[in-house]
C-alpha cells in the first residue's frame, strides 16, 4: 500500500484554503491528493498531473467534480494553468518527486533492483526510449557519465566497463541481468546498501529526463501561484534537493541594482514581483521513518509567494 510521505507536514505547509485552487503535480497513487480534497469545500479545485498513464487512469476513476486529472509532464504546468484558466490563481502546488509505490512494486515497469522484470524504467511507458534500448546502444562514455552524474556512483567506470563488455555477447534485457552485472563490477565494495541502488537511480533519472523536467517547471511556477500561495517540494536525493534549494534561495532575494544606476521605480517593482518567502526544510520524524522506511531520505522544502508593494 502506498503511504504518502510527510502527509501532515505537506498539508500544514501548503496551507489549504477550503475554496482554493491547488495543483498536485505528481499525483502518483493519490495519497496527498485525497487529503487535500478532504480539506476543500465544494468551491475548491484540485488539478492533478502525472506522466504515468496508469496513475492518471486511477485519478480519472475518482468521481469528484472538484478533481481535474491531466496526463502529462509537469514541465508543461504553465500551459495547463492557462488551459484551465487558473494562471496566477493557484493557492498551492505540490511536487512529491520520484516514484510511486505502484511503480516500484510492479516488476513489469523495471524500476526495482529487487524484482526481476523487463528493463524499462519509463514513467510514461507509452513514449520515449526504454532503459533496455538505451543501455544496449549508448556508448561507454555516455553510460559512464550518466552513472557518475545522476547516481553519484564512485564505481561508475567499473560498472560501465562490465556493461559494455557483456553486451558485446548478449543484450541486457532484464533488471536482474543488470543487477548481476553491477554486482560483478562493485558488489564486493558495498556492505550495507544495495550495489545497484545508485546506478538504477541514475538510469531512471536519465531515461525520464527528471532533472530537466524539474528545472523547466521551476521556471514557471511562481507565475502560476497567487500572492501568499505556497509551493511544496518533497525530494529524495541530493541532486533534486540542490536544484530546489537554489531555486528558492535565488528567488528569495530582492534584485540588487548597481549603485546610482538610473532605474524606473516601475521596473524595480516589476523585477521584484515574483519573490518567495523561504521556510526551514522539514525531514520525516523518527516515528514516520519507523512505519514507512521509504520516507527516510525525504526532504520537504516550501516557500510562499510575496508581492512587492
Ligand atoms: C512519489 S510519486 C507521488 C506520490 C503521491 N504524492 C501519492 O501520495 O500517492 C511521484 C509521481 O510523480 C510522477 N512524476 C514524476 N515526474 C513527473 C513529471 N515530470 N511530470 C509528471 N509526473 C511526474 C511519477 O509518475 C509518480 O507517479
From Swiss-Prot:
Predominant location category: cytoplasm
Protein's UniProt keywords contain rRNA-binding: no
Leading EC class: transferase
Binding site for S-adenosyl-L-methionine: 30-32, 50, 74, 96, 103
Cytoplasm listed as a keyword: yes
EC number: 2.1.1.199
Single biological process term from Gene Ontology: rRNA base methylation
Intracellular or extracellular location(s): Cytoplasm
InterPro entries per the UniProt record, alphabetical: RsmH, SAM-dep_MeTrfase_MraW_recog, SAM-dependent_MTases_sf
One GO cellular component, as annotated: cytoplasm
Its job: Specifically methylates the N4 position of cytidine in position 1402 (C1402) of 16S rRNA.
PANTHER family, sorted: 12S RRNA N4-METHYLCYTIDINE METHYLTRANSFERASE (PTHR11265:SF0), S-ADENOSYL-METHYLTRANSFERASE MRAW (PTHR11265)
Protein name: Ribosomal RNA small subunit methyltransferase H
Lineage: Bacteria, Pseudomonadati, Pseudomonadota, Gammaproteobacteria, Enterobacterales
Amino acid at each position: 500500500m502506498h503511504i504518502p510521505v510527510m502527509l501532515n507536514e505537506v498539508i500544514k505547509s501548503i496551507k489549504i484554503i477550503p475554496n482554493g485552487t491547488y495543483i498536485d503535480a505528481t499525483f502518483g497513487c493519490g495519497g496527498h491528493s485525497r487529503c487535500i480534497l478532504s480539506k476543500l469545500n465544494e468551491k475548491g479545485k484540485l488539478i492533478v498531473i502525472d506522466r504515468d498513464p496508469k496513475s492518471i487512469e486511477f485519478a480519472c476513476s475518482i468521481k469528484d467534480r472538484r478533481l481535474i486529472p491531466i496526463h502529462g509532464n509537469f514541465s508543461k504546468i504553465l500551459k495547463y494553468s492557462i488551459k484551465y484558466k487558473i494562471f496566477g490563481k493557484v493557492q498551492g502546488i505540490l511536487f512529491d518527486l520520484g516514484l510511486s509505490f505502484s511503480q516500484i512494486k510492479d516488476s513489469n515497469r523495471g524500476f526495482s533492483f529487487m524484482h526481476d522484470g523487463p528493463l524499462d524504467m519509463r514513467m510514461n511507458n507509452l513514449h520515449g526510449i526504454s532503459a533496455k534500448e538505451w543501455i544496449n546502444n549508448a556508448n561507454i562514455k555516455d553510460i559512464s557519465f550518466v552513472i557518475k552524474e545522476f547516481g553519484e556512483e564512485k564505481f561508475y567506470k567499473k560498472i560501465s566497463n562490465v556493461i559494455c563488455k557483456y553486451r558485446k555477447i548478449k543484450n541486457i534485457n532484464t533488471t536482474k541481468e543488470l543487477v548481476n552485472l553491477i554486482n560483478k563490477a562493485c558488489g564486493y565494495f558495498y556492505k550495507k546498501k544495495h550495489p545497484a541502488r545508485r546506478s538504477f537511480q541514475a538510469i531512471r533519472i536519465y531515461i525520464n529526463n527528471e532533472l530537466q523536467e524539474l528545472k523547466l517547471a521551476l521556471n514557471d511556477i511562481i507565475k502560476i501561484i497567487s500572492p501568499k500561495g505556497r509551493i511544496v517540494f518533497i525530494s529524495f536525493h541530493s541532486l533534486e534537493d540542490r536544484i530546489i534549494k537554489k531555486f528558492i534561495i535565488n528567488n528569495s532575494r530582492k534584485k540588487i541594482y548597481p549603485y546610482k544606476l538610473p532605474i524606473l521605480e516601475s521596473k524595480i517593482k516589476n523585477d521584484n514581483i515574483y519573490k518567495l518567502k523561504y521556510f526551514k526544510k522539514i525531514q520525516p520524524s523518527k516515528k514516520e521513518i519507523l512505519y514507512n522506511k521509504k520516507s527516510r531520505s525525504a526532504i520537504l522544502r516550501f516557500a510562499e509567494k510575496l508581492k512587492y508593494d
